[in-house]
């Protein structure tokens, strides 16, 4: 069996995260880790060294932008798919400014998510 890519899913919605993780394991054969806030995300990034970060805009406390800014300041390079239910021009522009690989507006299908993950894995842009 080929080596499974590691995905960190950072979203405070536990029910949605469980559904997404199950779908990613089945459809994409990924090893999925979950974090529900900024602190857990930071710890999981360093512990698991995932290939792709799925990051929700509305994380508790300071939010997804703060996580991205923190990673950028620390020089941490990872392909990031920024998930948002508020895909305004400002949100999308800021996500790309902070080095998001892709912005995925919610709601999205599992198929669309798997496609974006494969795109991120093929991309030269972390």
What are these regions (language model features)?
Residues 65-76:
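Short amphipathic alpha-helix used as the core "switch/output" element in two-component signaling
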Residues 48-54, 59:
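Active-site beta3 strand of CheY-like receiver
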Residues 14-33:
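Two-component/phosphorelay signaling modules centered on CheY-like receiver
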Residues 37, 63-66:
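Acidic catalytic/metal-coordinating carboxylates
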Residues 108-118:
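C-terminal output helix
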Residues 66, 87-102:
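Alpha4 helix (beta4-alpha4-beta5 surface) of REC/receiver domains from two-component response regulators
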